[in-house]
């Protein structure tokens, strides 16, 4: 008659150990920072960007969802306010060395629900490193406005047309937009309405 061999206690994984594995945070490829800019009450003589505030830097999937669910939704901000998500260490300003020679892809929306969806899809694509040219991406800005909301994807090397077109095509697919256009930061510094350099 066969008998079962005794099982050593050390061979049985403890419930606590299993729970620890489940609770371990899922690290992202890099750190990201949320920024907030409220221009709803502009003051005369105050430089652009003076109301820009760094909010939170995160590096795990769990932190991202916690911040997004509680705070960073375009529907939760007032008109003329901006939310930004940029790679940690890069400020959402033209003057930042990583942004100085770059530009931005822009998509517009006349409905808040659309902006919310496009914003979330873009955030997930960025933190999930879904772009082949992810090293050329700085971050994204959601601008809530009275007449038309705007989403802008900032990149580093505006003159690298191949990289920008690759990013543009991918982003257009991600947010399901009909048309998006790309402008250089240098043009935006000189003209209020910078012309589009690339379009997809």
UniProtKB/Swiss-Prot annotation:
This is Eukaryotic translation initiation factor isoform 4E. The keyword Amino-acid biosynthesis does not apply. Component of the protein complex eIF4F, which is involved in the recognition of the mRNA cap, ATP-dependent unwinding of 5'-terminal secondary structure and recruitment of mRNA to the ribosome. Recognizes and binds the 7-methylguanosine-containing mRNA cap during an early step in the initiation of protein synthesis and facilitates ribosome binding by inducing the unwinding of the mRNAs secondary structures. Key component of recessive resistance to potyviruses. MRNA binds at residues 44-49, 76, 94-95, 145-150, 189-192. GO terms for cellular component: eukaryotic translation initiation factor 4F complex; nucleus. EIF4F is a multi-subunit complex, the composition of which varies with external and internal environmental conditions. It is composed of at least EIF4A, EIF4E and EIF4G. EIF4E is also known to interact with other partners. In higher plants two isoforms of EIF4F have been identified, named isoform EIF4F and isoform EIF(iso)4F. Isoform EIF4F has subunits p220 and p26, whereas isoform EIF(iso)4F has subunits p82 and p28. It is found in: Cytoplasm; Nucleus. PROSITE patterns: IF4E. Displayed sequence is from cv. Heinz 1706 and cv. Ailsa Craig, and is associated with susceptibility to cucumber mosaic virus (CMV), tobacco mosaic virus (TMV) and plum pox virus (PPV). It comes from Solanum lycopersicum. InterPro entries: TIF_eIF4e-like, TIF_eIF_4E, TIF_eIF_4E_CS. Disruption phenotype: No obvious growth defects. Plants lacking eIFiso4E, eIF4E1 and eIF4E2 exhibit a semi-dwarf phenotype. Transmembrane segments: none annotated. GO terms for molecular function: RNA 7-methylguanosine cap binding; translation initiation factor activity. Keywords: Cytoplasm, Disulfide bond, Initiation factor, Nucleus, Protein biosynthesis, RNA-binding, Translation regulation. Belongs to the eukaryotic initiation factor 4E family. The gene is eIFiso4E. Mostly expressed in roots and leaves, and, to a lower extent, in stems, flowers and immature green fruits.
């Amino acid at each position: 008659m066969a008998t079962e061999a005794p099982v050593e206690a050390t061979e049985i994984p403890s419930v606590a150990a299993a729970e620890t594995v489940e609770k371990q945070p899922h690290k992202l490829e890099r750190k990201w920072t949320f920024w907030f800019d409220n221009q709803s009450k502009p003051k005369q003589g105050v430089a652009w960007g003076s109301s820009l505030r760094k909010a939170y830097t995160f590096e795990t999937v769990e932190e991202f969802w916690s911040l997004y669910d509680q705070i960073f939704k375009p529907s939760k901000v007032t008109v003329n306010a901006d939310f930004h998500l940029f790679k940690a260490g890069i400020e959402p300003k033209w003057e930042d060395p990583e942004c100085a020679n770059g530009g931005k892809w822009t998509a517009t929306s006349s409905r808040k629900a659309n902006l919310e969806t496009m914003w979330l899809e873009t955030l997930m694509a960025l933190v999930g490193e879904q772009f082949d040219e992810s090293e050329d991406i700085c971050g994204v800005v959601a601008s809530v406005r009275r007449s038309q909301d705007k989403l802008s994807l900032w990149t580093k090397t505006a003159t690298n047309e191949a990289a920008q077109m690759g990013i543009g095509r991918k982003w257009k697919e991600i947010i399901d937009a009909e048309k998006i256009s790309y402008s250089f930061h240098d043009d935006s510094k000189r003209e209020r309405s910078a012309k589009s350099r690339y379009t997809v």
